[in-house]
């Protein structure tokens, strides 16, 4: 390929992206950043560059990050065993302190530092700042072997009771990129660990985001999990229940899809589940005709 051919290819990419850039300019895009894309340095940098490009063309990105593997690693280092019930971490006082340290003190700082190093204007927040996320203790029951319901104490695991997005809106309007860790405050003065997908979805709803992106370690929703070419590129909200009944949406994908459905019902324009292991996944999903993940819309 000659230098001219390479240049023409780059020009075609830009021309393909142009209508999407024009369409999304001024719109809010909430990005749930998690999975493998948080662990590999090269992928981290590509995600940050994608976010900065969105910001540079007039799109308003808001980042909400997870950190489960890093929390597990820190708990292992201090000799504390992790326990989960239905995918939710049982969080005692010490575990909550460690989770907060990792999410707010380490990961949030690393993300904003990387964004700013590449020329961005990122500001780190936790859900406790300006009472962004107010939570209550999450009640939970499960069925025991006798078929009876038993209460389970998850400790300092919360569910969002109220959200005050004004601080995020203010930062976005001033040209900043908010980066939010999913630690919420309660009226009891305690800190609560919030599922990052849930926190991101609630923030997307409160901001009436045009798009909500979930970076995961899977390509999206596959009609056949054994066939990577069976990706469902678009799913309508009213098709979700049927796909769950058929088993097309199953296992760990169900809570992510339910999060997508709740976001749509809360006024979010569209929700995208995409593979964060693919370099520049965000740009490929938003700025190409075919996209690379599964888009949910009404």
Swiss-Prot record:
GO biological process: arginine biosynthetic process via ornithine; L-arginine biosynthetic process
One MF annotation (Gene Ontology) recorded for this entry: ATP binding
Site (Transition state stabilizer): 32, 256
Subcellular localization(s) per the UniProt record: Cytoplasm
Any Pfam family the entry gives: AA_kinase
UniProt pathway: Amino-acid biosynthesis; L-arginine biosynthesis; N(2)-acetyl-L-ornithine from L-glutamate: step 2/4
This enzyme's EC code(s): 2.7.2.8
Positions of substrate binding: 67-68, 89, 193
InterPro entries xrefs: AceGlu_kinase-like_sf, AcgluKinase_fam, ArgB, Asp/Glu/Uridylate_kinase, Glu/AcGlu_kinase, NAGK-C
SUPFAM superfamilies: Carbamate kinase-like
GO CC terms, sorted: cytoplasm
PANTHER family for this protein: N-ACETYLGLUTAMATE SYNTHASE, N-ACETYLGLUTAMATE SYNTHASE, MITOCHONDRIAL
Family as reported in the entry's similarity comment: Belongs to the acetylglutamate kinase family. ArgB subfamily.
Function summary: Catalyzes the ATP-dependent phosphorylation of N-acetyl-L-glutamate.
Protein name as catalogued: Acetylglutamate kinase
The species this protein was found in: Desulfitobacterium hafniense (strain DSM 10664 / DCB-2)
């Amino acid at each position: 390929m000659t230098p001219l051919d390479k240049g023409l290819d780059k020009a075609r990419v830009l021309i393909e992206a142009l209508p999407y850039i024009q369409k999304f300019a001024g719109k809010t895009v909430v990005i749930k950043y998690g999975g493998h894309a948080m662990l590999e340095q090269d992928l981290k940098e590509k995600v940050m560059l994608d976010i900065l490009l969105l910001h540079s063309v007039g799109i308003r990105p808001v980042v909400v990050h997870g950190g489960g593997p890093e929390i597990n690693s820190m708990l292992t280092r201090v000799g504390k065993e992790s326990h989960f019930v239905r995918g939710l971490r049982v969080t005692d006082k010490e575990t909550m302190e460690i989770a907060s340290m990792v999410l707010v003190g380490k990961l949030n700082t690393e993300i904003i530092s990387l964004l700013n190093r590449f020329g961005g204007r990122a500001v780190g927040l936790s859900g406790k700042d300006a009472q962004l996320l107010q939570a209550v203790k999450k009640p939970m029951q499960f069925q025991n072997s006798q078929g009876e319901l038993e209460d389970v104490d998850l400790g300092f695991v919360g569910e969002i009771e109220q959200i005050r997005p004004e601080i995020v809106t203010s930062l976005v309007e001033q040209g900043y990129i908010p980066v939010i860790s999913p630690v919420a405050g309660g009226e009891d003065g305690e800190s609560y660990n919030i599922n990052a997908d849930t926190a991101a979805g609630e923030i997307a709803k409160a901001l009436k985001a045009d798009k909500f992106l979930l970076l995961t370690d899977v390509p999206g929703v596959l009609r056949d999990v054994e066939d990577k070419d069976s990706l469902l590129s678009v799913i309508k909200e009213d098709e979700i229940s049927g796909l769950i009944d058929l088993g097309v949406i199953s296992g760990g994908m169900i809570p992510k899809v339910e999060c997508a459905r709740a976001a749509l019902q809360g006024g979010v324009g569209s929700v995208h589940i995409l593979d964060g292991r693919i370099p520049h996944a965000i740009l490929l999903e938003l700025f190409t005709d075919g996209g690379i993940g599964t888009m949910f819309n009404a």
